């Protein structure tokens, strides 16, 4: 009888190898499951520093850089385990992470699930979220509301599932952030994997929306936690453009791009009015410059520029 591995850990890689090598060490030190039952796949997305060959690790070397979704798909293509653990390269795992996540997903059946994710600042990263709408994006785009980020009111406005994120019981949610996801490999392939039109951001939202349409539930498992660095190595403005463009691709795919573009432009002009008033008291506030930057982000997103 051919033995089917229980777990394939798929790690998209771009950057420095050290954090991924630390994850590999953590996976090999897992308790509650035979480490030999954990297959490790690293998907090197043409990193400037190539990932080294490591004994017992499958390294997929992609021919061209394609972003998170393509790297995940390439990694899952090489995987053989029943459950795929999609792990960001900047995670820190404790030594019972795999066994506890397996127990949770096997309890719920054919699902996609994420643990609770904590940043190095000790704060949760709002893993569970509602499927995005134009109003959610505009709420985040409206800069005068930024001062309210510490409030649950603001988090609800941008689509965070406050009840799930602050609860202690397993919660069925719309979608979970993609830093640490567990899903059956057969389900991943049946749904068609990640949509490779997304370069960075929103591919996990789209994937889970398709899971929802197929009747596959998504769960947050708050009893299991991982630590996540977050942010990546790219400049902040570039990350903002990646996110904006990805949101436009998602909105176009699901039929509300025009609504999103119009609402963000209106919000940008409201931001301009608020910043103009602020500029009367603070000469460092460049209302016209902020407006130009926001309108250019929207235009680039419509042109699908990253």
Where do the protein language model's features map onto the residues?
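Short, flexible, basic/aromatic active-site loop/helix in glycosyltransferases
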Residues: 132-173
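Short, well-formed alpha-helical segments that are part of the catalytic scaffolds
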Residues: 16-30
């Amino acid at each position: 009888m051919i033995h089917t591995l229980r777990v394939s850990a798929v790690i998209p890689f771009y950057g420095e190898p050290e954090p991924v090598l630390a994850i590999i060490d953590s996976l090999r030190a897992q308790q509650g499951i035979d480490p030999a039952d954990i297959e490790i796949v690293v998907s090197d997305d043409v990193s400037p520093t190539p990932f080294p060959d490591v004994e017992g690790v499958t390294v997929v070397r992609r021919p061209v850089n394609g972003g998170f979704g393509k790297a995940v798909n390439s990694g899952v293509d090489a995987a053989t385990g029943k459950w795929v653990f999609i792990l960001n390269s900047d995670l820190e795992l404790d030594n019972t992470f795999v066994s506890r996540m397996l127990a949770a997903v096997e309890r719920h059946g054919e699902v996609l699930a994420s643990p609770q994710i904590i940043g190095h600042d000790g704060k949760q990263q709002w893993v569970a979220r509602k499927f995005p709408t134009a109003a959610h994006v505009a709420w985040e785009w409206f800069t005068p509301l930024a001062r309210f980020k510490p409030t649950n009111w603001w988090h609800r406005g941008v689509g965070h599932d406050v009840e799930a994120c602050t609860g202690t019981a397993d919660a069925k949610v719309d979608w979970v952030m993609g830093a640490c996801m567990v899903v059956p490999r057969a389900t991943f392939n049946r749904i068609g994997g990640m949509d490779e039109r997304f370069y960075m951001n929103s591919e996990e939202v789209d994937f889970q929306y398709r899971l929802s349409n197929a009747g596959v539930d998504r769960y947050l498992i708050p009893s299991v936690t991982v630590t996540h660095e977050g942010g990546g190595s790219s400049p902040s403005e570039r990350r903002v453009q990646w996110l904006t463009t990805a949101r436009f691709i998602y909105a176009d795919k699901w039929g509300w791009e025009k609504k999103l573009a119009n609402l963000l432009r209106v919000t940008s002009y409201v931001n301009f009015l608020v910043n103009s008033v602020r500029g009367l008291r603070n000469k460092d506030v460049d209302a016209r410059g902020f407006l130009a930057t926001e309108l250019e982000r929207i235009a680039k997103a419509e042109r699908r520029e990253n």
